[in-house]
């Protein structure tokens, strides 16, 4: 890899770290091509991705923002999983690591400055995604309106049943 390619890789990694909500750092040693492809497909379904990175280039892309903690993350054969939101890549990586013990979660990087350990990444994976939170919020907002509409319509429905009862009584 010559200097131009290295610089291009560093710029690519800088954009990954800048655009991703969180980056999950994993050791992938021992994964077969089929297993890695399965992981890539799962991540792609959620709009996330995984990329095998060279440790020195990843550290240069972070410009030393992580200090010694970052040096500990990027050792050995490293792949980074990342996505547009902070939760999706972490959820899929943790789930895959549970199913396949060859993938090891090392830690993560949150907002280019905060280093997460393995427990932090696992905790991040338990959080609801942004879409799930939006759905819950909309449900909470709509619930009172639905109840009010039901209460307001109830007297009219009861009155209609009373009139119907009188009409059937008179007809009989």
UniProtKB/Swiss-Prot annotation:
GO cellular component, one term: large ribosomal subunit
Alphabetically ordered keywords of this record: Ribonucleoprotein, Ribosomal protein, RNA-binding, rRNA-binding
SUPFAM superfamilies associated with the record: Ribosomal protein L10-like (SSF160369)
GO biological process terms on file: translation
Matches recorded under Pfam families: Ribosomal_L10
InterPro entries, per database record: Ribosomal_uL10, Ribosomal_uL10-like_sf, Ribosomal_uL10_bac, Ribosomal_uL10_bac_type, Ribosomal_uL10_CS_bac
Keyword Cell cycle annotated: no
Protein role: Forms part of the ribosomal stalk, playing a central role in the interaction of the ribosome with GTP-bound translation factors.
PANTHER family: 39S RIBOSOMAL PROTEIN L10, MITOCHONDRIAL
Annotated family: Belongs to the universal ribosomal protein uL10 family.
Protein name as annotated: Large ribosomal subunit protein uL10
Organism: Caulobacter vibrioides (strain NA1000 / CB15N) (Caulobacter crescentus)
């Amino acid at each position: 890899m010559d200097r131009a390619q290295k610089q291009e890789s560093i710029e690519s990694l800088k954009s990954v770290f800048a655009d991703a909500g969180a980056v999950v750092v994993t050791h992938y040693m021992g994964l077969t091509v089929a297993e890695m492809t399965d992981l890539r497909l799962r991540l792609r379904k959620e709009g996330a991705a995984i990329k095998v990175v060279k440790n020195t280039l990843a550290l240069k892309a972070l410009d030393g923002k992580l200090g010694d903690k970052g040096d500990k993350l990027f050792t050995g054969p490293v792949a980074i999983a990342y996505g547009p939101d902070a939760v999706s890549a972490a959820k899929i990586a943790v789930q895959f690591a549970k199913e396949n013990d060859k993938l090891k979660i090392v830690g993560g990087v949150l907002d280019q400055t905060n280093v997460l350990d393995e427990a932090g990444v696992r905790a991040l994976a338990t959080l609801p995604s942004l879409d799930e939170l939006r759905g819950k919020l909309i449900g909470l907002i709509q619930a009172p309106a639905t109840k009010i509409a039901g209460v307001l319509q109830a007297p009219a429905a009861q009155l209609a049943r009373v009139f119907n009862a009188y009409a059937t009584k008179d007809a009989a």
